[in-house]
A protein has these predicted regions:
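Outer-membrane beta-barrel channels and translocator barrels
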Residues: 77, 116-119, 165-167, 204-209, ...
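Outer membrane beta-barrel
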Residues: 112-230, 249-256, 326-335
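Outer-membrane beta-barrel "beta-signal"
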Residues: 247, 366, 408-412, 438-453
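Residues that define the transmembrane beta-barrel architecture of outer-membrane proteins
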Residues: 78, 102-106, 152-156, 192-196, ...
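Outer-membrane beta-barrel translocator/channel fold
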Residues: 209-240, 285-363, 426-444
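Transmembrane beta-strand segments that form the barrel wall of outer-membrane beta-barrel proteins
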Residues: 84-90, 170-178, 182-185, 213-215, ...
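N-terminal periplasmic/intermembrane-space "pro-region" immediately following the signal or transit peptide
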Residues: 2-107, 111-118, 324
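Sequence/structural signature of outer-membrane beta-barrel proteins
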Residues: 89-95, 130-135, 175-186, 220-224, ...
Length: 453
């Protein structure tokens, strides 16, 4: 605990000395974020896939006399944005064998976006880096640094994007703006996953019966602490050099939503994902959201279409006055462990340590979170997660005991003022195996997004 608190305190000092004052801060757009304030804010994996725009062009953020002087410039130059995103992360894990993985890193990114050219086209880039502040045993295994526990820098984004119409957008190049169920930025370390390819994103204009769609091809992935892009097939463990064709759609009608996503990687595997959600309107202050999902995986190596595991999941989320309760259940078939080579699996019962679904496994998870807005502490929240995993396929040579996990979170994300969006998190995680032994973790994170121009 002492090391975690030192990481937070020292990281804050470093951040405050490293940044320039800004009149307004942008909220941190990060996958692992503070818990939702209500049930309807709890995004499913398919919901997070679809936004009206995958990326946005630069917008004029300068005010006053300087803004007037820039009026004569083309929008491509005038609306240029630079955003500094400092980040510090402390990670400490001890597994049942006594192996320790510990590191404290400082880094972040500098993002560039141009304004619009011809009212449609713009470019963007983002440079990432992570440097060690402290390296404990097996620092490279924490994924905060390179596999050798050293610093790294990488150009993670370099793309061109265009608004084809008010409802359609295309992006091509290297980008991190992918948040689909089985391919996502997975931004839970210092640097997110980045993908190389092209995507078309769009939606119908009817808000009452809206269809969102996403199609494209992802040829390569740069994983979180890597500096090179590799074929999607190789990230999935194959020696082939193929990419992944992706197609996804989500239809929303009032309180109901249903969708699917398909991932086809030639010579490797096919993943099909289906999901549905129902958000009924209840009398205030109560809210409810019911969701279901199904994953089917098939191997394309050797016998085409050979079944891999499938998983069925259900989830109920209820809330009242900033208190949110989540109850989830999943069941994985006995064909094998659920595979998710390009992101965290979208399983409802995935926790911090137990982040895979084993063959034959049943899992139940409960989470209770609370935001302290009513007590004059906006931005402060706590969450507790408890999960139990049982009946995984076990053999004499590969025992798979039942497991229990508990995760505790404390978050503070400054809601307004000159430090708006500055986010602090401390978490403590435990996993116990029925056969004996436990894994423990401390994590401490500080993150901010600071518009420079």
């Amino acid at each position: 605990m002492q090391r975690a608190l030192l990481a937070l305190a020292a990281g804050l000092v470093l951040l405050l000395f490293a940044v320039l004052p800004a009149s307004a801060q942008m909220p941190g757009q990060i996958i692992v974020a503070p818990p939702p304030e209500s049930a309807d804010q709890k995004e499913t994996a398919l919901e997070s896939s679809f936004r009206e725009r995958l990326v946005e062009p630069g917008r004029l953020r300068i005010t006053g006399d300087l803004a007037k002087k820039l009026e004569g410039l083309p929008a491509f130059l005038r609306d240029t944005n630079f955003t500094f995103k400092p980040r510090t992360y402390y990670f400490d894990q001890v597994d049942p064998s006594g192996k320790t993985e510990e590191a404290w890193a400082l880094g972040g990114s500098l993002e560039y976006k141009s304004g619009l050219a011809w009212d449609r086209l713009w470019v963007g880039a983002e440079f990432f880096g992570s440097w060690p502040l402290n390296t404990g045993p097996n620092a490279g295994d924490t994924l905060l640094l390179t596999s050798q526990g050293t610093s790294y820098t990488v150009l993670g984004q370099a793309y061109v994007a265009a608004n084809l119409s008010e409802t359609n957008q295309v992006i091509a190049g290297d980008f991190t703006s992918v948040d689909t169920p089985y391919a996502s930025r997975q931004f839970n370390r210092m640097t997110p996953n980045a993908f190389q390819g092209a995507l078309l994103n769009g939606f119908t204009s009817d808000e009452q019966h809206r269809l969102h769609y996403l199609v494209g091809y992802l040829g390569k992935i740069k994983e979180r602490n890597a500096t090179d892009f590799v074929p999607m097939s190789q990230a999935a463990g194959s020696s082939a050099s193929t990419g992944t064709a992706i197609g996804a759609a989500r239809y929303t009608r009032g309180e109901f939503a249903v969708g699917l996503a398909e991932y086809y990687t030639a010579q490797v595997m096919n993943i099909a994902y289906l999901a549905a959600a129902y958000t009924p309107k209840l009398a205030a202050p109560y809210e409810l959201k019911l969701s279901a999902q199904f994953t089917d995986e098939r191997s394309l190596a050797g016998a085409s279409g050979t079944p891999l595991p499938n998983q069925l999941g259900i989830e109920a989320v209820g809330s009242r006055d900033f208190a949110v309760l989540t109850l989830s259940f999943t069941q994985t078939s006995s064909a094998g462990n659920l595979s998710s080579p390009w992101s965290d699996a979208p399983s409802y019962t995935r926790a911090e340590i137990h982040d895979t679904s084993r063959a034959g496994e049943n899992a139940a998870l409960g989470m209770l979170s609370y935001h302290f807005n009513r007590f004059g502490l906006p931005g402060v929240s706590v969450a507790a997660v408890g999960a139990y995993y049982w009946d995984a396929v076990t053999t004499t040579s590969n025992p798979q005991p039942n497991q229990t996990e508990v995760d505790l979170y404390l978050d503070y994300k400054i809601p307004n003022g000159s430090l708006e969006g500055l986010w602090f998190r401390v978490e403590r995680n435990w996993e116990w195996s029925a056969g004996g032994g436990q894994t423990t973790q401390w994590r401490a994170i500080i993150y901010w997004e600071i518009p420079l121009i």
